[in-house]
Amino acid sequence: MRNDMQRPRSNENQNAAATTRWIANAAVASLPVLAYFLGGATQKWEEGVVITFLALYLLARPPRFSLGALTNLVLLTLFILAAVAFLPASWFFQPEWRAALVNDLRIQLPSTLTPQPWITLTYLLSFAAGLSWLYVVSTQDLELREVRFQLRLFTSGIALLAAISIAFYSAHTTLAFWHNERNFGPFQNRNQTGDLFGLAGIMILACAQDDLRRGRKWWIVWILALVVIVVATILSLSRSGIGILFVGSAFWLGAFAFRQRSPSALALGVSFLLLLLTALLLFDGQIFERFRLRDFRSASISTDFWWRIFHDTFRLIRNSPWCGIGFGNFESIFAIFRGASPGDRRALHPESDWLWLWTELGWPAVVLTIVGIALLVNRVFPLRVGTNQGYRLAALIAALLFAIHGIVDVSGHQVGTAFAVVFLLGLSRHRPLSLNTSQWMSILFRVVGLVLLGTSLASVVAARGEKLLPGSVGVSSAKRLSAVTDREGNFSETIALTTRALRWAPLDWQLYLTRAVAEVELRETANAIDDFRRARFLEPIACEVPLAEGNAWLPYRPMLAVAAWREALRRAGPLRPEVYASMLSDASLTSPEVSPILEEIGLSEHDLALPYLRRVSDASFNRALAQLLRNDPNLHSFSETEKLALFALWSERGDSEEISRVVVQRADWLRYAWLGMAKYKASKGDFRAAYELTQRYGEPVAVPRVARNLSLQDLENRFHAAPDSYGIGYELYRAQMQNGRVDEALLTARHFSERPNSPAYFHFLEAQCWAEKQNWERAWNAWQAFQSTQVRATK
């Protein structure tokens, strides 16, 4: 009787344990999928949500096994290297950039090696979460079917999200927390989206092969999922994603065929690769163009940019301590070292995961990372039959290709991709595990879980509620709040917010710029000058910094505004005309100190002359134009396009008699000044000469194509049936002119030209009719109506 009662209780315990294990397995496999879904966890609140779930898992099911003394030593040393940044800076080599920040710019840096310890601490906690995740997935005591379950659940989750990405892209919509500019996928960086799809594609091959081997029809579903992944990878426009998918598939199929030692298996693998390549070409015929295989000259552009970024990164490494500059400091400090890699955008990273790691943690961290990967890969072997060898090989290939790709990209520095790769690497291990249990590991990771839970929850709450939490979250909140107070005119509060945030991020140029603008409004001139100088030093590329400085100084210290604007023009590069045009406000043009200087700048630079002439008053236009011609009488510095634009503006706003006088002296300028000359001829009553100039030098007019050769009678019948059809109207006009029926053609053209929204070319056709009738004045007037309609249409 007692045994009968114990048996159901034992079954209940077994069922409860099985349910618990199933939930735990599903949670582990779903965490990287959740990170991908939450915008790739690129925002701090998204990362906080992911780490919160990881922390809860650590508290509920902490790792019970140890990875071994050597692996533990490597991971512990990596964490210590990251924490070295909090040691006193005086213990290490003092780089020149730190001396410049402290001595020249008088920035109050903390005494730690990292110039921004609160920012470094934020990233250190994320690093600790990554190491904890590695330990969790690598020490799971799983049965072989549980390994398959986790890998299949992860792969199907990514395939489902790929399908959702395609659906959103087709519907021209997206989720609020997805950050891609093209509305495809969650990541802002297309390579991170493509890489994750490529990894999933490799895993799909293993899943499909396993179902096919076991005689299950699920392999059909996996093939459909692979099609979705291929389409999504192509739509992501990621070369690296396509490369990982194709190369990884080739390695896995090659290894599969080699292990089978069967010609049919080899043929099947080759056939599948050819089929995959065919699918890629069918979906995207320009795939080779994207890999730049057709144009070696253009291929060298991106390669050259990489090498220049790498060159400047190595300059930063040489000018920094052996242990790096600390987490979270690359962007701020690298801007100071950009010499060989100039550009109009701020470099957020060195285009390489490995160089990024080297810069922030030093070369020992790179060596230890390679050793750690080697130790983990060593635990993958042997790949014997009956050990999920197909799944594990696919996971290993995917992880290694991702690490290799990290040489020239930075996908490993995002939670959404890093957690996925760590998951695959951890499940590629040979099981059952040959690891020793350790009670200390459970205690350690529960403590880590508590720390991560507290910090991640605080991060989520602070990010969503714009709380001033010390670290990167608080800095972002302070920027948003200071923007609000600045718009409201509460400049004292703006200064207070930015000053507080600068204690956490003393190398943030945006904070100095915002504070400086507020200081100008409060007449704190000395402080504003210092903060503007700091902002320009920390952001030496963007023209927006000195442009904003000049705008702030203009009402109070005009000469300081001019100095800042000169720097903005120096930085602007090809954007100089737009930047200069933004300076030509009513306030600057009416300022007695600024206006002459802006005129001097505009009339001495060929690319700035047109913005200046467009902005000056009609009374000043002719005087400014005369000065321009004195500075450059032959317009040698102007390009052909600039000459055409200059004379078009001159014809519109200038003195037509002066244009005539200049063209008489310089006959070769007639091809630029023909419109002004035509207006001059018309003003003198010579409408024929005016009209003929438009026909000689005017641009060809776009008119509808005539594909049919219908008779005049047929066209008249069609026109009477559809009198509002522009195409039929043009065909009828054309047939009437060919048959010499000019008066009827004129009526047809005017039928449309007198309507307000008709195409501009009907005015042109009307002008042709009047010219055919020798009525040159009306031909000229009709052509002017055509030109004005075209101008309105382009605005």
Task: Name what the model sees in each region.
Residues F37-V49, S165-F168, Q188-N191, I223-G254, ...:
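Helix-loop-helix junctions and helix-breaking kinks within/between transmembrane helices
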Residues F53-L58, I202-I204, I244-L253, L274-L275, ...:
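Transmembrane alpha-helices of multi-pass inner-membrane enzymes
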Residues P88-W91, Y169-W178, V227-L237, G241-L245, ...:
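A membrane-periplasm/extracellular boundary helix in multi-pass inner-membrane enzymes
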Residues N189, W307-L348, W354-L357, L361-V367:
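TM-adjacent membrane-interface loops and short helices in multi-pass inner/ER membrane proteins
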